[in-house]
Amino acid sequence: MNQAFICDAIRTPFGRYGGALSSVRADDLAAIPLRALMARNPNVDWQAVTDVLYGCVNQAGEDNRNVAHMASLLAGLPHQVPGATINRLCGSGMDALGTAARAIRAGEARLMIAGGVESMSRAPFVMPKAESGFARNPQIFDTTIGWRFINPVMKAMYGVDAMPETAENVATDYKIEREAQDRMALASQLKAVAAQKSGALAEEITPVSIPQKKGEAIVVDKDEHPRETSLEKLAQLKGVVRPDGTVTAGNASGVNDGACAILLADEATAKLHGLTPRARVVGMATAGVPPRVMGIGPAPATEKVLALTGLKLAQMDVIELTEAFAAQGIAVLRLLGLQDDDPRVNPNGGAIALGHPLGASGARLVTTATNQLHRTGGRYALCTMCIGVGQGIAVVIERV
């Protein structure tokens, strides 16, 4: 069986909602890391790419009509290279990576690009068509995040809790204290700022030039979301679901814009194109959980991928766990028997600080983990995420 290797990975900075990247179309944003991959690897015959797989969650606006292939064409990849867009909600970018690796291991592909994109700032409003000629009270939905066009049967069967509500459910069911959530949020911010200062995050970012109506273009070269805070400031924030709730804007991930791309190949193809393998994709697994507590999804997904690969959690030198909400992050750690402040977890900050552009986040976790393994000399990394409507996804990679 062939092995799938990550040979290069790059992302844009992650922009705040309405921030520096908000003027960039989603398809153009998706093309930026692809273009960077091409520039960084001049010896590759890009027509040899079997497929481009990109995760994207919204797909209701400028990311419509298969944004993976649109981005491929916009980036300048040969038109012979196909592309497909994957939607497993928040796990989309990670699913794209795992699916690409599976194709290589199966011998059906030799050179693949995987990644993801999300422009939450540019998510459109949508409305359904009238069911009759004189229909009244049309609904309008903001597609930025969450439910739209709700199926009443689904609502009756499982409920349609908003994402912050699912986090409150997790906090209640698993007794996750408010102070513990705020401590995780503060740690995420502090680690992210330290990683920015040390240059650790800069290794994985390609700068984005934003044209201005007047004057020179603005160059964005770092994530916009990290911010200074303290436990005292975090404790003053009110709950977003209810005033006495524990989930706040301070201990939840951001609404963000960004894109990420990863180049994968088997060993022979990497050598043929002058590429250096950096990490082997060992395996991927997904799992389902009740939608009302979707945030615990990484726990069973992690257990499945470890069973699949024959590895143990103790062997993981780096753990990249998406911080959709601190409540769910802590619940997952405790379900896996880990401490809230395990030093292996998100050593460069997590989504609370760096942001969570949905379709891109999974690819970002794998990119960050690959670089961290090489900085520290670690062998294995676990990357895992929760997924809306009740799923989890996990990938294990090995440094080479």
Spans of model-derived segments:
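Active-site pocket-lining segment
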Residues: Y54, E168, E204, Q212, ...
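Conserved catalytic cysteine-centered active-site region
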Residues: V24, C56-L111, T144-W147, M157-M163, ...
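N-terminal extracellular/periplasmic Venus flytrap/periplasmic-binding protein-like
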Residues: R11, S23, D27-I32, N43, ...
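Flexible glycine-/small-residue-enriched beta->alpha junction loops
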Residues: R105, L111-N169
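Active-site-proximal alpha-helical scaffold in enzymes
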Residues: I86-E118, A171-A200, A261-A268, L333-R334, ...
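Conserved active-site "lid/cap" helical segment
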Residues: M1-A71, A75, P82, T166-R178, ...
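Condensing-enzyme catalytic core mediating Claisen C-C bond formation in acyl metabolism
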Residues: M1-V24, I145, L231-I296, P300, ...
